[in-house]
From Swiss-Prot:
Protein name: UPF0246 protein VV0659
GO cellular component, one term: cytosol
Family as reported in the entry's similarity comment: Belongs to the UPF0246 family.
Coiled-coil regions listed: none
Stored InterPro entries: YaaA (IPR005583)
GO biological process: response to hydroperoxide
Source organism, top-level taxon: Bacteria
Amino acid sequence: MLIVVSPAKTLDYESPLVTHKFTQPELVDYSKQLIEVCRQLTPADVASLMKVSDKIADLNVGRFQEWSEEFTPDNARQAILAFKGDVYTGLEAETLNDDDFDYAQKHLRMLSGLYGLLKPLDLMQPYRLEMGTKLANPKGSNLYQFWGNVITEKLNEAIAAQGDNVLINLASNEYFKAVKPKALDAQVITPIFKDAKNGQYKVISFFAKKARGMMARYIIENRISSVADLTQFDSAGYYFVEEESTPTELVFKREEQH
């Protein structure tokens, strides 16, 4: 079972590291091409392209300039510990043990606009470049055209290495659009998390992102290898709803949070 998640905009390069193991990202030659494009951008370009404040634009112009082809523990940290958005709040990687990290290294991948596909312990220099960014590049007008089949091919390598042909899609639509499901050597299963609000169950972004992280952790901690076991997920009050699920979409619901 291979899990795919989105990255996060919020980053943490300050907290103490809970593991000193690390690996090198595999698609740096592609990242380098994107960095060369991004280094041509002014702060005003970045603010407009990424729809961010001048302060965040300045920060990221600096990051593009400082980015180095050499990834070391001094200028980078493991991706699973550097990302800090809602998904990663649910994942709580800082409390995983060494065996969990080893398992995650084989069974978890993070999609990324700049790095393409990251293993949990891959070193990552700080950046902001979302997959949906309309950044003109040598291969087209956006990052989906830039990455083409590269991410899908890397996922197929990971699927082959970890032993079955099931991919659990815990990524957002924006990121999973960078994957070509028909070319994957796997059955794609997408968990859907719905929260009760005013008497109706719907996907509420903040809760759903956190739940995706919790499910990734559930798979890692419990070494889940079958879809049947996946339906036993019950973290934070979620429960599986069989009658609303299909072979490719697993629906989980939760009562209103007070």
